[in-house]
Amino acid sequence: MSNLIPAVIRSKAEASAASLWVIHYFTACGFLELFPWVGSGYDMERFGILAVATPRHADVFIVAGYVTQKAVRRIQRIYDQMPSPKYVMALGSCPMTGGMYWDSYATVKRIDKYIPVDLWVLGCPPKPENIGHGIVMAMNAIKGGFGGH
């Protein structure tokens, strides 16, 4: 009986990693690089990833593109509406440093000051292959027991 509980926990983590539901917030070119994952190029549903319309059903929150001071409130509200465990991916240079809008008074330079970020995907914009690598890394981390937030 004592071996059953770790086996159930492991199998729950594997099932969670194999069926990620995603909500996104995109404002710039990072979104364009995600198109191959939505279409037949990489077909995210083949990996068990499904885009959902409401944060209440989402496991993963993807933020791409520049974030303004006004938009950060929306991002925080989306994050707060997600059930636990929840995971956050930031795509591209804009959520990390403000990107090419770094010198604007209205641009948020680091999104991780407002919501916790679990995975950063580098690039301006990030290539679809890098996004895929990040998704696989996230799946492996969840399988390995990473509990998110």
Predicted feature locations:
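A charged, well-structured terminal subsegment
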Residues: 121-149
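N-terminal, charge-rich interaction modules
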Residues: 1-57
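Functionally constrained cores in energy, signaling, and assembly domains
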Residues: 6, 12, 24-30, 74, ...
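A short, terminal or domain-edge coil/loop segment
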Residues: 2-7, 79, 141-149
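Cofactor-cradling patches in redox/metallo enzymes
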Residues: 35-37, 46-116, 121-130
